[in-house]
UniProtKB/Swiss-Prot annotation:
Pathway: Pyrimidine metabolism; CTP biosynthesis via de novo pathway; CTP from UDP: step 2/2
Protein residues bound to UTP: S14, K187, T188, K189, P190, T191, Q192, K223
Family from the record: Belongs to the CTP synthase family.
Annotated protein name in UniProt: CTP synthase
UniProt keyword annotations, A-Z: ATP-binding, Glutamine amidotransferase, Ligase, Magnesium, Metal-binding, Nucleotide-binding, Pyrimidine biosynthesis
Inhibition and activation profile: Allosterically activated by GTP, when glutamine is the substrate; GTP has no effect on the reaction when ammonia is the substrate. The allosteric effector GTP functions by stabilizing the protein conformation that binds the tetrahedral intermediate(s) formed during glutamine hydrolysis. Inhibited by the product CTP, via allosteric rather than competitive inhibition.
Region ranges (Amidoligase domain): 1-266
Top-level taxon of origin: Bacteria
Binding site for L-glutamine: G352, L380, G381, M382, Q383, E403, R470
GO terms classed as biological process: 'de novo' CTP biosynthetic process; pyrimidine nucleobase biosynthetic process
Amino acid sequence: MTTRYIFVTGGVVSSLGKGIAAASLAAILEARGLNVTIMKLDPYINVDPGTMSPTQHGEVFVTEDGAETDLDLGHYERFIRTKMNRRNNFTTGRIYEEVLRKERRGDYLGATIQVIPHITNAIKEKVIAGGEGHDVAIVEIGGTVGDIESLPFLESIRQLGVELGRDRTLFMHLTLVPFLGAAGEVKTKPTQHSVKELRSIGIAPDVLICRGDRAIPANERAKISLFCNVEERAVISLKDVDSIYKIPALLRSQGLDDLVVKRFGLECREADLSEWENVIYQEANPNGEVVIGMVGKYIELPDAYKSVNEALKHAGLKNRVSVTIKYIDSQTVEAKGDEVLQGLDGILVPGGFGERGVEGKILAAKYARENELPYFGICLGMQVALIEFARNVAGMADAHSTEFNKATPFPVVGLITEWVDEEGNVEQRHEASDLGGTMRLGAQLCHLLEGSKAAQAYKGNTCVERHRHRYEVNNKYRERLEQAGLVFSGLSSDRKLVEMIELKDHPWFVAGQFHPEFTSTPRDGHPLFEGFVAAASAHQKRDLKK
């Protein structure tokens, strides 16, 4: 199979939405029957984002094969059916690490290792390998043109453009076309300078995606075409919209997919965007609203919970309600108590690391349990629910996780020292292990308890979900917790690790050690999120009747 490559770069400012634009184009091409994948090349020196602060970088998205990747890969999976893997995201740090490892082994036979050709060759090899087996591979280059960190990546794709030829490569550049209120007009000069910068390093864009808060007038598009040496039909206006799921149709209406298909000489059907039209209709026509309190510690940056936010919205679509997320700092719960939890239709406690704010999460779980408020715990959210139950129901007053208190008399949650990975291999860890790349990661099979809410949600006795954690339920206390009424509704493939818990006599109190948000999509949703939002809606209706 001959793979075609679309390289997506950004200019003027960061955070223009290259990932959404790339994913939207991929969705249109997929709707035309093409097999599409997307890659993200990140210019930072970290080997992966696994140890980066969520408040700086946003969430870490985990792929099926256990790669800790950029949150843009979450966008990719939500827009197309192709599942991402570790080949879909790599960083400057990983490239340098691999090149230096080869140098130490003597693979370069004494050569002087340089950015060109050794680093650029390593980048090109990964891009080609990531695109194998697909009709089209869209490659997003992180950062902004002009950043020193991005230069090796830009040089690599320039070389690929020459080596593969114009019939297999296309360069798409995303820029900002701002509107100046005082002048009453849009300004194209930033775009012109961005393209000039790109051309100075040898890349001439074939398509310009021009971002702005309004549609760009035809005369300004003609001006951009003239000064940037890009066909006028290839100057695409991408205005702000109230839903990212409207972007595929917006790009399709301007013929971006036709331009790509003709450039590559591909024969394929017209795009069928009916599934996306259905998503947009459901989003615009809810029959009600629910308020979900998300009790977390990284709430100053909502992107730290990007996949959870999107999964709640997807569940709202399936339940025909709009979901309003109320972000609640868990430290505020510690300081003010349950008064900040009033008026919610459900509580969700997401994952997290470190002791800060953990008692607030435990209080949130207690409030939900005692007030029969729907509760959904994810990763740490499951652990705090179990700790709360152990303390206040099972009679273990000082129960805790050894992550937060190594001297606790009741370590109901402890470090996982051994587990079986998705390929059946035994993994081992200890307290002195590195932080990076040492967690239980990736898709794992889970056995569900027959008759449990979990089994009802999944409509079966097994599920496969993605993990990212170091700590687990301590099996020493399982029997005591079960006797107190806690239901262990999900177990690992070898039945040695607890994957899900729930409360039997509660409208909806379910928690999982895994991260179900990573597999939720706008078209398909996710059974646990759907069940949670349905329970929140039912709780709201009961309150209204009272």
